[in-house]
Amino acid sequence: MNIIIEGAENIDSLPYVDDSVNENEQELINKLISDEMSTFTPPDYLAQLPSFIDIDYNNFQFLENDFKRMEKEEKMKEFDIGRYKVEPTTTMIKQQLNEKQWNDSLNNARSQLEHQDIRKINLELLQRYGGNSWKLYLSDLEILQKTLKKQLDQKKQQIEEINIQRKLSQEQTFEKIQQHDKKFLELVYKNTEIESACKSIELEIEQLKLKQQLQQQQENGDLNNK
């Protein structure tokens, strides 16, 4: 199961040729991002987890008792370690124990002896095989660490190659954009020149029309005088 953590993605695909934005542009960008994110449905990161199980705490009275104890700020009752103790014989004689108490004490002593024997066996096994077990465990960890490091290096190499390709692609595209921008400015300049020339021609035409009208009026006036 993959655990999805919000904001855990490491995105390093930054632009290589774009100019840095100013404060006003940054504010506008942040506002546009916030407006767009407000339309998104919040992701449910717990959808892949098992459904919630409602536990009936009435079946766990010991928890309720502990909660009450904690509310009262009472300390937990100490464990009874009496059965782990072996009373000295002199003390038992002074206490004038009956036969049952003597048998219980004897059984307890046997239990303690058996427990110590088991601990001794465990220590012997640990001394004999524990070192090799830890060596094997550490060897497995080293192999796992090397494998993960190799995978990490491969991923880093892939990311580096992709970023290099992106940089080259952006630089080539940027050159084309600059060429198109230059051509666009040249065309705009030419259009401006053409527009200016057209206006000059239109003005000249208007002047010629006006001159022609004046000449016609003058000719008509001369005819009327005759």
Swiss-Prot record:
Coiled coil: 58-222
Chief subcellular location: nucleus
A GO biological process held by the record: mRNA processing
InterPro entries tied to this protein: SPF27
Matches recorded under Pfam families: BCAS2
Keywords (A to Z) from UniProt: Coiled coil, mRNA processing, mRNA splicing, Nucleus, Spliceosome
Signal sequence, start to end: none
Subcellular location field: Nucleus
A GO cellular component entry from the record: spliceosomal complex
Subunit architecture: Component of the pre-catalytic and catalytic spliceosome complexes. Component of the postcatalytic spliceosome P complex.
Family label: Belongs to the SPF27 family.
Function comment: Required for pre-mRNA splicing as component of the activated spliceosome.
Protein name according to UniProt: Pre-mRNA-splicing factor spf27
Native source species: Dictyostelium discoideum (Social amoeba)
Species classification: Eukaryota, Amoebozoa, Evosea, Eumycetozoa, Dictyostelia
